[in-house]
Amino acid sequence: MKFSLIAAVALLALAQGSFAQDAADLEKITQYFENLKNKMTEDVTAFLTNQDVANQAQTFMQERKTQLEPLATQIQEQLRAAATKFEEHITPLAANVQPVVENFQQQMEALVQKLMEKTRSISN
């Protein structure tokens, strides 16, 4: 009978230890799910915050584009006018400079021709 009592006490002790281990495991699992819930909440909040920033940036860009389009059109018109005026001034200047350039080219060709003749006469 003593042996039966000792075996029963040992069995109860093992069962109690097993339940204690299960309780510790249950606590770990509960803590894991709590951490997972907190992490998911943080991630979703960060995602939604980033989406809000992206939407704000998109809205900002659209507003600035709307503001800058008239300015860009105005600058293009001014550049066209400046190009027209520049062309009006350059065309007569180019016409005046062309004879000078042609004269210079003829003088340089004559000089090169003389140098070639001198080189030939020296080499012979």
UniProtKB/Swiss-Prot annotation:
Location of Pyrrolidone carboxylic acid modifications: Q21
Q: Where in the cell is it found?
A: Secreted
Record's keyword terms, sorted: Antifreeze protein, Pyrrolidone carboxylic acid, Secreted, Signal
Q: Which GO terms describe its cellular component?
A: extracellular region
Can you tell which superkingdom this protein's organism belongs to? Answer: Eukaryota
Span of the signal peptide: 1-20
Q: What family does the database annotate?
A: Belongs to the apolipoprotein A1/A4/E family.
Per its database record, what is this protein's job?
A: Antifreeze proteins lower the blood freezing point.
Name of this chain's protein: Type-4 ice-structuring protein
Origin organism of this chain?
Answer: Paralichthys olivaceus
